[in-house]
Amino acid sequence: MHDAVTRPTPPSDATAWPRRQTHAVQIGGVTVGGGKPVVVQSMTNTDTSDVASSVKQVAELWRAGSEMVRLTVNTVEAAAAIPRIVDKLAMMGIDVPLIGDFHYNGHQLLTAEPACAEALAKYRINPGNVGFGKKKDLQFAQLIEFAIRYNKPVRIGANWGSLDQALAAKLMDENNLREQPWDAGRVLREALIRSALDSAEQAVELGLPRDRIVLSAKVSGVQELIAVYRDLAQRSDFALHLGLTEAGIGSKGIVASSAALGVLLQEGIGDTIRISLTPEPGQSRTQEVIVAQELLQTTGQRAFTPLVTACPGCGRTTSEFFQELAKVVQNHVREKMPLWKIHHPGAENMTLAVMGCIVNGPGESRHANIGISLPGTGETPAAPVFVDGEKKVTLRGDNIAQEFVALIDDYVEHTYVRSAG
């Protein structure tokens, strides 16, 4: 692999790099870039023209914590549905910015359904398929004109699965003339970056302000994505949307996305993220939101809900109870967090530990705000609980889970100041 840019020097301490400075882009009521916290977004997989199903899924994603939601707009029926979806969400008290995902025919759809152009909070434009040949510039310009008319931001989202083939061929020809030609992978990365940057500059020339442009350049390989975004970050001051495209299903998708985005976020690159998971059969679409939040929280970018530290278990642990307790605790704090966020701000930063034996249990529990060390093999059947580093109580018997959860609730009630109202 060839990095196109020099990597920044890491800080000498354990902190991440400072956030990259970008234009601040207002998307509905959410600000992306400009030093604001990294924003979590998601995407529906419903038929957008099915208003009821789309509203239901947007609401689920919003309740899970998605701060922006993207929907496919691929037909006139889908475009016509967008204002109705916005209205129904508003009736439910849900004010989440909706992003229209356009490919091939966006200019035609917005011309046919201008109410869609007005209702959306942002447009996503793919420079690789917005048009071909002589029609490309015209059709791109039509979409930008809608954005200007309705005061909407756009994301210019290049993707190596739909790369501008004319640009790629041009750069391949130029590469053949180099004294030391780049490898094909580097040329394709450059084509992806140039596609995004050139389109952004074209939008600016058409009259779209820089603070209404977000860029992305997605690939499905971890190392390629890191190289692309390092380069893109050094060559522009546009806000950047991060995502590993087609990340995959299950643990593979989670690990690949986290490996790529974690590196970039630690280097201060990225203003909004999406985890592009393929849902497993029967799995909720909200999984991608939870993974995005946990990635941001574990890398120290933001705090959404208390996370539970728990040991994996070994031959010293006597049962699966500590694993079950860890799950109970994590589910409990997730369920409580919407109310805690209102009445007990700061509770999202609380740290919890559920440990399974004496080896690391007491030590890890002391590091947490509240921790419990359950007995392992051959240990006294008692579970000491530590609060802010000090042993507070020892739990015994059949109600340890309920008693520990009650201690957590009591801690939140008395530690995090209740807001008025």
From Swiss-Prot:
Q: What keywords does the record list, in alphabetical order? A: 4Fe-4S, Iron, Iron-sulfur, Isoprene biosynthesis, Metal-binding, Oxidoreductase
Please, which domain of life does this record's source organism belong to? Answer: Bacteria
Q: What is its EC number?
A: 1.17.7.3
Per the UniProt entry, the disulfide pairs are none
InterPro entries assigned to the protein according to its UniProt record, in alphabetical order:
Dihydropteroate_synth-like_sf (IPR011005), IspG_bac (IPR016425), IspG_bac-typ (IPR004588), NO2/SO3_Rdtase_4Fe4S_sf (IPR045854)
Family annotation (PANTHER family) = 4-HYDROXY-3-METHYLBUT-2-EN-1-YL DIPHOSPHATE SYNTHASE (PTHR30454), 4-HYDROXY-3-METHYLBUT-2-EN-1-YL DIPHOSPHATE SYNTHASE (FERREDOXIN), CHLOROPLASTIC (PTHR30454:SF0)
Task: Give, as in the UniProt entry, the pathway in which the protein acts.
Answer: Isoprenoid biosynthesis; isopentenyl diphosphate biosynthesis via DXP pathway; isopentenyl diphosphate from 1-deoxy-D-xylulose 5-phosphate: step 5/6
What this chain does, per the entry, is described as: Converts 2C-methyl-D-erythritol 2,4-cyclodiphosphate (ME-2,4cPP) into 1-hydroxy-2-methyl-2-(E)-butenyl 4-diphosphate.
EC supergroup of this enzyme: oxidoreductase
Q: Which Pfam families match?
A: GcpE
- Enumerate the catalysed reactions: (2E)-4-hydroxy-3-methylbut-2-enyl diphosphate + oxidized [flavodoxin] + H2O + 2 H(+) = 2-C-methyl-D-erythritol 2,4-cyclic diphosphate + reduced [flavodoxin]
Q: Name one GO biological process term.
A: terpenoid biosynthetic process
Annotated protein name in UniProt: 4-hydroxy-3-methylbut-2-en-1-yl diphosphate synthase (flavodoxin)
- Gene Ontology molecular functions: 4 iron, 4 sulfur cluster binding; 4-hydroxy-3-methylbut-2-en-1-yl diphosphate synthase activity (ferredoxin); 4-hydroxy-3-methylbut-2-enyl-diphosphate synthase activity (flavodoxin); iron ion binding
Q: Where does [4Fe-4S] cluster bind?
A: C311, C314, C357, E364
